[in-house]
């Protein structure tokens, strides 16, 4: 473990690249996790879930004139 940490901290360029790579990977995983949670939490409120209800009755509207 110490040798891996030593190799990462040996040069500043490797250290910075490791930080940027880790941040990039974390951002991707975090984005996917939050989107999945958001869609599960708002299941009946999202457009993709209620679109059928609104488009289904679109041509059936009657004019009272």
Curated annotation (Swiss-Prot):
GO terms for molecular function: ubiquinol-cytochrome-c reductase activity. Induction: Expression is also regulated by SSN6. Disruption phenotype: Leads to decreased vegetative growth on several carbon sources such as citrate. Keywords: Electron transport, Membrane, Mitochondrion, Mitochondrion inner membrane, Respiratory chain, Transmembrane, Transmembrane helix, Transport. Signal peptide: none annotated. One of its GO terms (biological process) is mitochondrial respiratory chain complex III assembly. InterPro entries: QCR9 (IPR008027), QCR9_sf (IPR036656). Component of the ubiquinol-cytochrome c oxidoreductase (cytochrome b-c1 complex, complex III, CIII), a multisubunit enzyme composed of 10 subunits. The complex is composed of 3 respiratory subunits cytochrome b (COB), cytochrome c1 (CYT1) and Rieske protein (RIP1), 2 core protein subunits COR1 and QCR2, and 5 low-molecular weight protein subunits QCR6, QCR7, QCR8, QCR9 and QCR10. Belongs to the UQCR10/QCR9 family. This is Cytochrome b-c1 complex subunit 9, mitochondrial.
């Amino acid at each position: 473990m110490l040798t891996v940490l030593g190799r990462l901290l040996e040069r500043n360029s490797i250290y910075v690249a490791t930080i940027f790579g880790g941040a990039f990977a974390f951002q991707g995983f975090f984005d996917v996790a939050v989107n999945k949670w958001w869609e599960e939490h708002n299941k009946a409120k999202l457009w993709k879930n209620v679109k059928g209800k609104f488009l289904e009755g679109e041509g059936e509207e009657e004019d009272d004139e």
